[in-house]
């Protein structure tokens, strides 16, 4: 009986010798896996933190920043020079007495010059100055910035339609040539280098409500 117990004890001891390295190996593998997982999570966390930090450092530009960038880019890197020729002034007959419109000038003789470019989206940006005869046949200068979103319905893209705005400053004789800020709608139809552009000056009865159009030639 004692011999049998001794044999069992030796067998148990030998089994333990074989099992201990196995447990050690499994423990090492688990430790390595846990370490790798921790490193991966730490790396992902660092990457997320860096992206969040970059987002906080580089916020989307504001409207004024975009406007300033567009003005600067148009002035410093124009793609074309433009000749402006005033074409027509029309006083809205539904908002004027005939006695008024009969004596108003609707032939805005004058000229202007500007620079322009197309951005990466194909939209139009311009800086310009222009002078023309106003409704009282007096000289009226205007200058500013123009923007149009452009559409090209044909495959050859020679014909373009534009819709946007112009912001600038004008001066009139009947207002003693005091600088007056203006913000007006802008629309155009273009064929290759020639554009017919127009704006509408809103107003009240017998005041404002004027359609003003001009030709623009790129060279």
Curated annotation (Swiss-Prot):
Gene3D superfamilies: 2.40.160.20. GO terms for biological process: lipid A biosynthetic process. GO terms for molecular function: acyltransferase activity. One of its GO terms (cellular component) is cell outer membrane. Disulfide bonds: none annotated. HAMAP family: PagP_transferase. This is Lipid A acyltransferase PagP. The lineage of its organism: Bacteria, Pseudomonadati, Pseudomonadota, Gammaproteobacteria, Enterobacterales.
